[in-house]
């Protein structure tokens, strides 16, 4: 992995399962199985990313557990508990033109149709009905806002997303 590539975090390793080094998996993917579509994984252990392969995985009750290459004892698995699971950015699936990964939206400037800079996307929240952009307002916001919440509804409030230019054009009143 080159030093300028930041892995995309897809989950984390949980507690041990059994005595043969299996670990519970917490996945941040849409479905828990989705994390197993990617191989190899990168594991962040002691601040360093290293490559690891999943040998096999299965459901264990309501949890998902996995056997990782080179992890054959409970003691070794315990050393990996709470380590992040990542992949290289180029391992991500290509998306249709009007879909975006959250990581690509974070850091984008949000500009309304009147040209007002509303701030920068700080994080995104999944609400069930639609995602919501949490926009950190500029230090000298004319409306005294610190943060804004904008529904990510393309065509209604989100007019254009320029991932390369790191800008999102919105139809939204900055005072709301």
UniProtKB/Swiss-Prot annotation:
Gene3D superfamilies (UniProt xref): PRC-barrel domain, RimM
Domain PRC barrel: residue ranges: 97-176
UniProt key word Repressor: no
Compartments where found: Cytoplasm
Keywords attached to this entry: Chaperone, Cytoplasm, Ribosome biogenesis, rRNA processing
A Pfam family reported for this protein in Swiss-Prot or TrEMBL: RimM
Coiled coil: none
A single MF term (Gene Ontology): ribosome binding
GO annotation (BP), single: rRNA processing
InterPro entries named among the record's database cross-references: PRC-brl_dom (IPR027275), PRC_barrel-like_sf (IPR011033), RimM (IPR011961), RimM_N (IPR002676), RimM_N_sf (IPR036976), Transl_B-barrel_sf (IPR009000)
Any single GO CC term annotated in Swiss-Prot or TrEMBL for this entry: ribosome
Assembly with partners or alone: Binds ribosomal protein uS19.
Functional summary from the UniProt entry: An accessory protein needed during the final step in the assembly of 30S ribosomal subunit, possibly for assembly of the head region. Essential for efficient processing of 16S rRNA. May be needed both before and after RbfA during the maturation of 16S rRNA. It has affinity for free ribosomal 30S subunits but not for 70S ribosomes.
Family statement drawn from the similarity comment of this UniProt entry: Belongs to the RimM family.
Entry remark concerning the domains of this protein: The PRC barrel domain binds ribosomal protein uS19.
Protein name: Ribosome maturation factor RimM
